[in-house]
């Protein structure tokens, strides 16, 4: 008893995911999106490194060595209290110490343009995150609506099954009084079996859509998952659809894929400047401080550090004369990339228009289908109710009854499908205008 109670409480406490819940969770956990964020972090590091390259570099160095001269016969002579002492030290030590700096003063603005280029790359990485997020949100919305539709389809199929069961029971009663053949009853039984099959198929499709949605959310397949069922009213499906031109004009200004393609053009222009700088001279400066010590010098370490200290400052000018066409090739390739970027902008705008046009056509087409199917369901329901009464009175045969039932079921399913497809495409059109997805 306690186990049953715990199971009941667990089932009742299972979370129902709204569309917003699904989107918010995916934005934090989807692996593809996390990979895009890592690319952005990498681009940020590239930008920081290029900015640091504008500054001088500084390094310190030291070298310590020890040597041994086994055949050395003379050494260092000292006089102490009138006594002459000679010390032969076959082992000796040397040390050098240095501090060096270098700075590229000017290289045709290559360094500064590289900073600008890496800033553009960083912006593009950020836009790529937005592109990935938008794509995931669209897929989530599509799967979410498919799940809503399949839930409704299962409900309609179950209602159809109940009707089939009643018809089958009524057929058995009519058979007993001799007013129906066994062949006609078999058709009613087959209809009931077909409705049961339709339910199984719809439930299988529902499970598949849920699995796809869980995969987008990075939820393991063994975790319980179900969505919140919002009230999708007929008024939502009948709402006004924005014009194709207004959606496209707005999308051109806010969609990250368009902005990203335009940044490709900026990137190619900067690469052109960097390539052209290969024809210009490079001015560099170097400086250094150094000293050295040795055990054979006869003076102490501190004195040697001071005596041997030296400082240096230098400048170098590198003028390119012939580089085996490397610079010319880089310039030409940058020009090719610029032309490619222009074509990519046109292609992205074309793809955007095609996508929006598809959603707009689907929204309008399904809305018209929905309006038509509403009256069709009413008429088919009235027709089937009349057929059912006439069948019970023996005025209609089994074929006419089953035909009427099939027409009603098809009309109900068409109404559901057109309703949810209209709502989905309306939401996607709003999404392309910068609004959040919601049902």
Segments from the language model and where they lie:
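Short segments within alpha-helical structural elements
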Residues: 194-219, 374-435
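Sec/SRP-type N-terminal targeting helices
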Residues: 34-38, 51-52, 91, 105-133, ...
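Small/polar, glycine/serine/threonine/aspartate-rich low-complexity segments that form flexible
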Residues: 61-103, 230-240, 273, 286-319, ...
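Bacterial Sec-pathway N-terminal export signals of envelope proteins
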Residues: 11-63, 69, 221, 227-266, ...
């Amino acid at each position: 008893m306690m186990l049953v109670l715990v199971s009941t409480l667990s089932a009742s406490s299972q979370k129902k995911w709204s569309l917003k819940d699904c989107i918010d969770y995916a934005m934090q956990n989807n692996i593809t999106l996390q990979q895009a964020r890592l690319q952005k972090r990498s681009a940020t590091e590239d930008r920081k490194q290029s900015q640091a390259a504008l500054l001088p570099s500084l390094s310190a160095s030291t070298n310590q060595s020890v040597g041994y001269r086994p055949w050395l016969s003379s050494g260092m002579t000292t006089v102490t209290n009138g006594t002459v002492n000679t010390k032969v030290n076959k082992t000796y030590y040397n040390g050098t110490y240095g501090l060096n700096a270098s700075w590229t003063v000017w290289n045709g603005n290559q360094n500064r343009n590289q900073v600008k280029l890496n800033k553009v790359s960083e912006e593009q990485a950020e836009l790529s995150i937005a592109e990935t997020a938008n794509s995931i949100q669209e897929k989530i919305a599509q799967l979410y609506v498919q799940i809503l539709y399949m839930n409704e389809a299962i409900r309609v199929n179950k209602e159809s099954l109940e009707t089939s069961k009643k018809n089958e029971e009524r057929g058995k009663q009519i058979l007993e009084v001799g007013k129906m053949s066994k062949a006609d009853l078999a058709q009613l039984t087959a209809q009931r079996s077909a409705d049961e099959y339709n339910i199984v198929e719809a439930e299988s499709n529902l499970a598949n859509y849920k699995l796809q949605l869980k995969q987008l959310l990075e939820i393991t397949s063994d975790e319980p998952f179900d969505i919140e069922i919002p009230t999708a009213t007929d008024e939502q499906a009948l709402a006004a659809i924005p014009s194709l031109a207004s959606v496209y004009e707005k999308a051109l200004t806010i969609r990250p894929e368009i902005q990203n393609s335009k940044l490709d053009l900026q990137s190619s222009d900067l690469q052109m400047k960097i390539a052209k700088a290969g024809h210009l001279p490079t001015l560099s400066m170097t400086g250094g401080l150094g000293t050295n010590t040795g055990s054979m010098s006869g003076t102490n370490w501190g004195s040697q550090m001071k005596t041997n200290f030296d400082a240096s400052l230098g400048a170098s000018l590198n003028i390119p004369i012939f580089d085996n066409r490397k610079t010319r090739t880089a310039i030409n390739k940058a020009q090719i990339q610029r032309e490619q970027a222009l074509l990519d902008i046109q292609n992205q705008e074309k793809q955007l228009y095609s996508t929006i046009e598809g959603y707009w056509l689907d929204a309008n087409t399904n809305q018209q289908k929905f309006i038509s199917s509403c009256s069709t369901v009413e008429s088919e329901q009235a027709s089937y109710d009349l057929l059912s009464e006439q069948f019970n009175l023996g005025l209609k045969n089994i074929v006419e009854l089953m035909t009427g039932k099939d027409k009603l079921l098809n009309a109900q399913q068409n109404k559901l499908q057109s309703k949810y497809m209209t709502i989905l495409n309306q939401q996607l059109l709003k999404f392309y205008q910068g609004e959040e997805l919601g049902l």
